Each structure stands twice: as structure tokens, then as C-alpha cells.
Amino acid sequence: MALVNGNYLKLKAGYLFPEIGRRVKAFSEANPDAALIRLGIGDVTEPLPQACRDAMKNAIDEMGTREGFHGYGPEQGYAWLREAIAKHDFQSRGCDISAEEIFVSDGSKCDSSNILDILGEGNRIAVTDPVYPVYVDSNVMAGRTGDANEGGQYGGLSYLPITAANDFTAPLPSTPVDLIYLCFPNNPTGAVASREQLKSWVDYALEHKALILFDAAYEAFIQDPAIPHSIFEIEGARQCAIEFRSFSKNAGFTGTRCALTVVPKGLMGTSATGEQVELWGLWNRRQSTKFNGVSYIVQRGAEAVYSEQGQAEVKALINFYMENAAIIRRELSAAGLTIYGGEHAPYVWIKTPEGMDSWGFFDHLLNRANVVGTPGSGFGAAGEGYFRLSAFNSRSNVDEAMRRIRAL
């Protein structure tokens, strides 16, 4: 008899986005002529940068020759891409990160889940609330939590509320924790963390020998030069942090798949017997065993992001989406809604109207305006009463969605 992983049975009824898909499918079947505008899931809509497309076309042509063919590549990523990432994304900002500390992968969502493979089951875990659901669900699947309570919070996790009441600034844990998930710019709220705020987290982690798992997937959308793009801009972070990044949102690689994880050499964890163990070696072994690497063609496309042409085209993409965010902020504010985020991230975080909860507002927009967004309660108990709209769409769709919502 094949036994299932019982931890999966502890998951709530459905992962947030499949539940959205279920409701949208039911609506579409009942209203086949409705012209839906999707501002929910954070998928990009604009074409890949020309520099990336050209690089991938050239790589395909290389693969068509015996001399240029590439089979299995290094599980950690090709050296030329790792070196470009280290130089442009980290060393240019004063971060002491080498190419060897960068692991190229097929998604930061995957890596932020897979990192649990090298971390023990007894860790005390802190997440913000609201939170990107993957951080919580992956811990549930791995058996790192208890059951969920009526509010959807799992035993064994410390929830750190980020709401308008605390200016979306996560408080430091009131009890010691070992793993801390941070995402800035934040998904879903769009909030950012100042240098001083990040320093307080690094100081906490160093004091308590905790590990920060820092998701910087949206760092390219930061508009203020004073706001850090990386946890490694903070002194001491090499001794307490792992960072996840992605090419999905800045360069449109959601359908192409390329990301990276930074594991500094010398970053240590503790074994059950109290021995100090370097996490770089464990992650390297994990990737070498379970991952065959990102394709040569895709990595050449990612490398082109760092060319002069690629940088200009990526900047244009980011500006386009941030202009969409500005339109959403302006129009919904004019409609009398209370708006947060959307200034350094492609997400606008909306306070739902009085007397309407998150899923109620979802159904209201779906049925009355034919606009799809994301209920805040799907990101955690503290997200109840909020709603997320994404700036990832065409300008015409964003304009039309705002016109419909304002007409309600």
C-alpha cells in the first residue's frame, strides 16, 4: 500500500491562485461573452526584450552545430552568467558577493521552497502576514508546521503582521525564531524596507543565530535610490542571509524560467549534534543531486539582460509597468478607495470598501466590472479587508479596468 505525504492533507482548501482560477472559470462558463480583464496573478504581459530574444536565437543556432552544441550544463549555472550577475546586481551596489556564491535556477518560487531540503525540521519559523503563500504552504508540505486554525494560521509558525496600522513595517519577533522569511519590495502589499529596517533584521538574526530567507524578486521596481535592492547591502548579512532573485518580472521571463539564489560562503548552520555546517556546500550538493540546470539557451537570454541594450530594454519594461501602477493608484484613489503600494512594486494594495471582505470584493469586481484581482485574505489573516491589483497588463486593459471600476 502506497502511503501519501499526510502533510499535504493539512493544506487549506486550495492554493490561492487555483481558487481564483476556479471562480473565474465558473464565471466565464456562465458568462461566455464577458470580456474579463485579469489584474490578479503576477504574470507579465509584454514581450521579451529584443536583446534577450536575439541572444536566445543565436544560442539556438549554436545548438544546431556540432561545435556549438551544449548538453548538460553546470547545475549551478554557466560561469559567464554567474559572473555577470555578481558584477551587475551585487558588486555594483557594494555587495561582497562572488560568482561562485550564485546558483542559477528555474525560479525563485522553486528555490524558496527547495531551500527547506537543507534546513532541519526543528526550526522555529517566522513569516509576515500577509505573506506570499508559497513560504507557508511549502513548510506545511514539508511537515514543518502544525494544523491550521479557523483563521487559517498554522501552528508552529510565528506570524508578523504588516498592515496599515504599523505602516506595513514587520515587527521583530517577540519570541526567538530560527528562520525568517522576508520579501521586499513586498508581495502582496508593495511595501519596501529602508536600510535601517533591514539592518534591524540583520542585527536580530546575528544576535539570535537566525537565518533570513530574503526574496528580492521585485527589487528592479524600486524607484528610490536610498532603498536597498539586496539584503547584502547591509553589513553582516553574509553571516545570516540567503537571497532569492528572478528574471521573471524585470525581464519578462515568467514563461522562459530563469532565477538565482545567493548562498554566501561561510554562512553556517548547526547540525543536530551542534556541529557548524556551511550551507553553501549543502545547497551545492542539493542542486547537483536534484537539479540539472537551466538550459543553455535561456541562460544566454538572461546574460543579455546585462548588455547595454538589455539594460535599456529592461528599464523600459519596468517603467511601463510602474506607469500602469501609477494609473491604478490615481484612478482608485479618485474613486474614493484607500490605496497602498504601487510606488516601488508592481502591486497596488487596496483597502476594501466598508462592509465588504476580501472575497466579497473579489466577487463584486468579477461580477460587476469583469475585473479579476487577488483577495488579500488569500495571503493571510492580516490580509482580510484588503485586495491586490497587479500592474502587469497592457495599458489599454489597465485603462479599461479602471474605467469599469470607477463606474461602479
Curated annotation (Swiss-Prot):
- Could you say which enzyme class this protein belongs to? transferase
Set out the biological process GO terms recorded for this chain's protein.
lysine biosynthetic process via diaminopimelate, diaminopimelate-aminotransferase pathway
**Where do the annotations place substrate binding?**
15, 42, 109, 132, 187, 292, 388
Task: Give the transmembrane ranges.
Answer: none
Q: Which Gene3D superfamilies match?
A: Aspartate Aminotransferase, domain 1 (3.90.1150.10), Type I PLP-dependent aspartate aminotransferase-like (Major domain) (3.40.640.10)
Which cofactors does it use?
Answer: pyridoxal 5'-phosphate
Q: Which residues bind pyridoxal 5'-phosphate?
A: 72, 108-109, 132, 187, 218, 246-248, 257, 292
Question: Which keywords annotate this record?
Answer: Aminotransferase, Pyridoxal phosphate, Transferase
Residue positions where N6-(pyridoxal phosphate)lysine is found in the record: 249
Q: Which GO terms describe its molecular function?
A: L,L-diaminopimelate aminotransferase activity; pyridoxal phosphate binding
Please state the pathway this protein functions in, per its UniProt record.
Answer: Amino-acid biosynthesis; L-lysine biosynthesis via DAP pathway; LL-2,6-diaminopimelate from (S)-tetrahydrodipicolinate (aminotransferase route): step 1/1
Subunit structure of this entry?
A: Homodimer.
- Family of this protein: Belongs to the class-I pyridoxal-phosphate-dependent aminotransferase family. LL-diaminopimelate aminotransferase subfamily.
Give the function comment from the record. Involved in the synthesis of meso-diaminopimelate (m-DAP or DL-DAP), required for both lysine and peptidoglycan biosynthesis. Catalyzes the direct conversion of tetrahydrodipicolinate to LL-diaminopimelate.
User: By what name is this protein known?
Assistant: LL-diaminopimelate aminotransferase
Give the gene that encodes this protein. dapL
